[in-house]
Every structure is written in C-alpha cells, then in structure tokens.
Amino acid sequence: MRVIERNVRVGRIEIDLVAEDGEDLVFVEVRTRRGQDDLAAETLLPAKLQRMWRAAIGYCDRREIPPERIRIDAVAIDLDSNGTARRIEHFRGLEIPEPPPE
C-alpha cells in the first residue's frame, strides 16, 4: 500500500489518508485514543463510515476514477498515558452500513 494523499477535504469531510493498494483506491480513517477506557476502534461509528463513503465517491467523481476501485479501511491506535502505542489495528475493506430510513 502506498499513501498518495493526506488530510484531503471533500466538501466538509476530511479523509485522513488516500492510498493505492494494487487496483484499489483506499480511503483510510485513522482513530487514536490516549489512556482512555474506550478503544479507538469503538469510535468507528456507522455515520462516520457513511460520510467517508460519500466523500470517497466525490473524490473519485472529480478525478473520473471508477467507484469500483474504492475500498474503505480504518486504522485504530490506542496509546498509553505516555503516548506509546499499545494497540494498532488495521481494518481492511469495511462494509458501509446503510443509513437508517428517514
């Protein structure tokens, strides 16, 4: 995997990392928590993933990239109170939940 952009804004949404992994264009959300009881992975909420998906579609539309190449990943980093990583998890190819009916 090769990072090609960092902190990309698409409308009001910021994508932490955009990377290429073979034919996939990977949009990565990075979540970090320091010395807290909750885990960084627990903060990957469906609404955030839905916004990331919409941002990825917008990113690809502007660059005429087929949406079939999109992959959504997340990296969750848990730090101890000194800032040392105690857990790093990489979630590949997350399924994006359907938004609730209005």
Task: Cite the ranges covered by each PLM segment.
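A short acidic/basic microdomain associated with nuclease active sites
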Residues: 1-11
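Structural motif
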Residues: 12, 23-25, 69, 88
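Hydrophobic residues on conserved beta-strands that form the core of alpha/beta folds
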Residues: 3-5, 27, 72
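Domain-level recognition of nuclease-like catalytic cores that cleave nucleotide substrates
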Residues: 62-102
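Short secondary-structure boundary/hinge segments and terminal tails
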Residues: 12-14, 78
